[in-house]
Amino acid sequence: MHRIAIALMGAASLTACSVGSDEGSTVPASGSGPTRAYAVEGFDRIAVAGGDDVDVRAGTAFSVRAEGPADELDKLRIAHDGRDLVIGRQKRVLGFGSGKGVKVFVTLPRLSEANIVGSGTMTVDRIEGTTFEANIAGSGDLNIAALTTDAAEVNIAGAGTLRAGGTIKRLEANVMGSGSLDAAGLRVGEADVTVAGSGNVRAAVSGRAKVELMGSGNVDLGAAAQCDVSKKGSGSVRCGR
């Protein structure tokens, strides 16, 4: 459990630094008023800070635009750092901010990693490929309609929630705090799940699973899962019939 806690906090710290700093190149906005467009391409990872609402769609071409009150869009910072698209606030703006009605629309060929720091919401229509990684630090939400990959890694530190449907071969899920992986509609071949705290994990696992639970959380991997369980605390684990 100590190893998992260190890994989770490390991921959260790295994400916070990348979103909150001046690293990467700021992408200038075109347009004015309640709509802005940003000419940026060549990224496959997205990092979001604060309370913004981000809508991500898979498509053949790259596109980034934002809608909302003009004064809030003036504070928005879109940056490009290698493979990363970073959505945050200008350095002169204290804290991450609430977003106050800002919505960012992103289209890209494939999303390989999603990072949320704060209370933002990211909604993704579909993710395909070999691997996918998601990191949530705070109370943010990540909603994925269809996740189809060989492997997926989910790290949640705080009260955030990841919801997903689809089919993957292997899942690694680490939850620390009161967060949740709510993926009863996600079909998984095999899984490695760790929960420390009052968090919850739900998925439909058809093969072997390793579960480590410490605290009052709950893990439900469905009736077909064949689990090796290590449990300490008042939490519950459901595996198999």
Regions found by a protein language model. Give the residues of each.
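Acidic (Asp/Glu) and glycine-rich low-complexity loops/linkers
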Residues: 2-10, 17-117, 121-135, 146-153, ...
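Short, surface-exposed interaction patches in beta-rich subdomains
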Residues: 162-241
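Conserved acidic catalytic centers in enzymes
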Residues: 50, 138, 215
